[in-house]
Amino acid sequence: MKISSRTAYITVATMGIVSLFGDVVYEGGRSLIPEYLKFLGASAILVGTVTGAGEFIGYILRLVSGSLADRTKAYWVFIFLGYGLIAVVPLLGLAPSYEIAIIFVILERVGKALRSPSRDAVISVVSKGIGSGKAFGLHELLDQIGAIGGPSLVAAMMFWSSNNYSSTFILLFIPFAALVVALLYAYKKVGRNVQPEVKEAAKGNKRLDKHFYLYNVAIGLSTVGLIPVALILYKGASIVEPSQQWLIPVLYVVVQAVDAPIALIAGLAFDRVGIKMLVLPLAASFLPMLFISYGGLTEVILACIAYGVVLGMQESIYRAAISGLAPAGARGTAYGIFNMFLGLGVIVAGPIFGLFLESQLMILPLAYVAVTQVAAIFLLLQSTKHTPDEEISL
């Protein structure tokens, strides 16, 4: 069975447009969540813990949803349910306390858990004719246009409304409506056409070998040593004046603006170099903590740029590598497992880096990051000693 390059490009592009509108909503909201929780009374440790816990719950659920998607072949059902839960982001504007806001934050992560494995499985299956690196890089590029637009919209609204959190979040109902329209169009345009091909590809070999698991342990360990972007923004919020809090979403825009082109460039390079390309983002994961350890707002901006570089490669080539390590019949499960290991790293990193920020012990976190990334690189290189048992034919 062969999926044409034209079908592959159309599928990746339409799914990218859906993700674009999704990112306008949830990345716009997420750019404001750290300082919003702080405004509602949450501490740095709580923000770090909630960020990590929300990500972890979402990632664990991806293992379940990915496995269910492989078993039921109902990939588009999970995609629709997952994108539908983005509605909780505008509802943050109605939260009366940080406890309620935390529930909404976690629900948004649940939605991402439902949609991500199925969406990535669909993209990975159709990417054979154009290259998995290019496919995920292109998808991430479109995705990041929304990720830039969302925080920009939020920053403008915060400035215009004199830092009115409620009005800013409620405004996000408008792009959410556009998301619903785009998703319905995407399913009508390509969903029905590629669904039979995705189902057919998913009938094959479902075995995941030790190299796949070594890779995932490496990714999880690297994430343990990467400071969460929420805490970079929290650091920024503690530096700027109260009247300048609208600058924090702008910092998040910087992250996404760097992420977008890096994702496509890294994806194209991955198709040429292969999985060893991942040594670069693992090594670069040291930089964000280095920058915020010394200095003020300028260093926070540099940390955002460095984080954007890592994130761009993470969102494209981390995902693309799964295509070469997992057979098509287990892609939903494989992406679920991948995200579970990623989530284990996030849940550990959140409170650890939160403690580092509050303790202001800068040498210790730098040593911690260096050790975790070196160990992750070692495991990654071990996972590359892999000759596939079969060429994954789609």
Where are these regions (language model features)?
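Helix-loop junctions at membrane interfaces in 12-TM secondary transporters
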Residues: Y9, L92-V105, S293-A303
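Transmembrane alpha-helix termini and helix-breaking/packing motifs in multi-pass membrane transporters
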Residues: E35, F39, G149-S167, V348-L364
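Helix-loop boundary and gating motifs at the non-cytosolic
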Residues: K2-E55, Y213-E241, Q245-L251
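Helix-to-loop junctions at the C-terminal end of transmembrane segments
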Residues: L61-K73, M158, I262-G274, L357
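Cytoplasmic helix-loop-helix junction between adjacent transmembrane helices
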Residues: F104-I145
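Structural signature of the two symmetry-related core transmembrane helices
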Residues: V77-L91, F173, K276-F291
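Symmetry-related core transmembrane helices of the 12-TM Major Facilitator Superfamily/SLC fold
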Residues: S167-L184, L364-Q382
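C-terminal transmembrane helical hairpin of 12-TM major facilitator-type secondary transporters
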Residues: G274-Y318
